[in-house]
Amino acid sequence: MRAQAHHAHAPARRAPAPNIPACGRGDVVLSLVSPRSWYQRGRWPLFGVDAVSTGTRPCRFNMGSRFATVVVSSGRTRIWGSADCVPGAGSQSVVLSRGVPAVRWIYWDRATSVPGCRRPGRPVHQGAYAAIAFDGQLASQVMVVLLGHPGSYLP
């Protein structure tokens, strides 16, 4: 089994011209959203990488599959990354305007992965996992995602 990120893209404006400057590091806030905090057996977690400009002018931001990514971990162990098995450049430049979010939706197939897909993924067990959005410089807050029935986590 090869662990993959399955991408569902929200409409975003592609950069119409190269004269729009790239967003500065302090001009973008990255967050991670999900419609659920727990996913029953057989359901794939859905993550939204959400980028919002806080700058005063429109700017270009890379929302591509190799740039605006999600990483899932358990404790200190890295479990899965949305960019691990992405072929090609994975670049998609969008224009961000102040306060208007651009979102890229990503499904996790509940399997492990490693950068470059150097070994087959394995299904993960039910439990609590930490997820974070990352673009190489910016990181979101950590989100906890539960796999399995929520009652199974009670002592």
Model-derived features: where do they sit?
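Primarily secretory-pathway and cell-envelope proteins
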Residues: 1-97, 134, 138-155
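Residue-level preference for beta-strand/loop junctions
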Residues: 43, 100, 125-127
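Intrinsically disordered, low-complexity Pro/Gly/Ser/Thr-rich segments with frequent PxxP/GP/PP motifs
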Residues: 85-115
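Short acidic/polar inter-strand loop motif in beta-rich domains
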Residues: 111-117, 137-141
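Short glycine/proline/serine/threonine-rich loop/turn segments at secondary-structure transition edges
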Residues: 113-127
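A short tyrosine-centered beta-strand micro-motif
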Residues: 127-133
